[in-house]
Amino acid sequence: MPKHFVGLDIGGSTIKSVIVNSAGEQIGPIVEVKSLVKNGYEATFGQLDLAINELCAGAGISVADVGGIGLDVPAPSSGGVIWGKANLGDDWVGTDICAKLNARTGIPVHMTNDCNAAAIGEYSIRHKHIGSLLLVAPGTGLGGGFVLPGGKVYEGTNGLALEVGHISVPFLEDNGELPACTCGLKGCMEAWVSLVALRRCLQNELRKPEWATHHLNSPDSTIEEKAFQLRTLAENGDALAIQLFKRQGYILGYGIADLVRVLDPGLVVLGGGLAESKFRDQFLDWVKGGFNERAWSVYRHSPIEPEKITTHFEWAEGGDGAASIGMAYTARELFGH
């Protein structure tokens, strides 16, 4: 029987999994189970077993018919070994997860980080795109991934390539200082473009006289709860929310211009929760505004026919399943020949 390939996206709370056949066609829906990552990798492996068994049952095959597993984690890794904790339990760090899972299942395993997986997923579902693809995904932090023509993600020597949130941008706080990033440095793009940054910026704005009567100035909710409301407020035209997202979009585009200058991708894909927002077209305009301010003219209005514009922007299409789809695609590419 032709082999099938499994993609597993391990998050802090859930595992999203998918199975594809030898032709790369998804079989059945995405299967989701709890990840239990804080309980250690052995507990998560038990959940992976559940997901794989359910996928195989839905596809009408046995686990023996699985030819490879692609796995992504919310942590840096290299050669199958996780070396940064991120949202995982302590015993994940320093462990060769690929070797452990291979020994448990008898199936070859490849692992990368979650943003790389999502980038591969976005590449794999764009069947007409044959060039390189840069994914930039604002979320709690700001992640990214770069897929080369042919579908291979660039991971770097240490698995740290495309930490896009930690390129420097020259934007100052109201006090004239560069904002501090969670990585310990100052001036990182993530310190402006992330949920963590949005909370700080909201708190700073609410201290200003012009927002004294804004309903978010109520003492009845935390800054986290207030920031959670901003997307809905922006969708309904709230001036404060729009101001905050407009600045985020502009700075994101400004930083993307530097990434484009280094990587020269034909397509930039924007991921994260804003891909599902009702004001995403407006946000993309703000991103392009920052990009056009910083980008070389060749990336804005190329003299090369026929496009005339060499850098295209699109929103992510894979949704929550992009990473698992990307890892199934990777497993098929690595182990299917």
PLM features: residue spans?
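Structural signature of FAD isoalloxazine-binding scaffolds in flavoprotein oxidoreductases
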Residues: 160-164
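Beta-strand initiation motifs
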Residues: 25-29, 152, 158
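Short clusters of small/polar residues that mark proteolytic maturation junctions
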Residues: 30-32, 87, 157-159
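ATP-binding/phosphotransfer module of carbohydrate and carboxylate kinases, centering on a glycine-rich
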Residues: 1-67, 77-82, 99-107, 124-131, ...
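Short alpha-helical segments enriched in small residues
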Residues: 115-118
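Short beta-strand segments
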Residues: 9, 68-74, 112, 134-141, ...
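Short beta-strand scaffold segments in enzyme catalytic cores
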Residues: 15-19, 120, 142-148
